[in-house]
Amino acid sequence: MKLFDCAPLSLAWREFLQSEFKKPYFLEIEKRYLEALKSPKTIFPKSSNLFYALNLTPPSAVKIILLGQDPYHSTYLKNQQELPVAMGLSFSVGKNAPIPPSLKNIFKELHANLGVSVPCCGDLSAWAKRGMLLLNAILSVEKNQAASHKRIGWEAFSDQILMRLFEANAPLIVVLLGKIAQKKIALIPKNKHIIITAPHPSPLSRGFLGSGVFTSIQNAHREIYHKDFDFSL
């Protein structure tokens, strides 16, 4: 079995990244990920959603990048069935999943900054379809084990995605929340893109609420595209 057999990737992204897929580092990622799928361990998101962030936002449509760390590793119960919270988009959860604390803080800050109504569900797919790439630096995780797939090597791949976008699309609005995401500043060409930073929205971090991050994103979007980004969900 090949990676794209169980984890579909759109033609647009396959063409955009085609030179990466035969490189040794990517073949090693593929090997390690497929081994993880075959193991008794449960891997999130489900493989069909591994590249959901890319599939919802084609490379030519990317206007904003909101970089996450790795997928949610927890589950929730629905009709006595255990389901993953992770669904392939950074910070986002499925329509029926409980809204995690970090996402609650994102919605609070969005409402405080722009007056956007706090939604009742945490599915951010609509943002992705409007040009916000909701990419996690690490694309998979083992159930109940945060950052457990760091060893797979996903960051080498996500770094290449970012660098290719930085070369191809100008200017982009790059949103980096927290110290781990902000390490990616080193990848961003100077004076070409708008970089917006803020503390991580986790309740364990301080300073996200009141940071004005969504005001900054909206101002940047107006500057580039002369209109507001639609944050409604």
Swiss-Prot record:
Q: Report the superkingdom from the record.
A: Bacteria
The record's section on SUPFAM superfamilies has:
Uracil-DNA glycosylase-like
Function description: Excises uracil residues from the DNA which can arise as a result of misincorporation of dUMP residues by DNA polymerase or due to deamination of cytosine.
Q: State whether keyword DNA repair applies.
A: yes
Which GO molecular function terms does the record list? uracil DNA N-glycosylase activity
Similarity section: Belongs to the uracil-DNA glycosylase (UDG) superfamily. UNG family.
The protein depicted here goes by the name Uracil-DNA glycosylase
GO BP, sorted A to Z = base-excision repair, AP site formation via deaminated base removal
Keyword DNA damage in record: yes
Q: Which organism is it from?
A: Helicobacter pylori (strain Shi470)
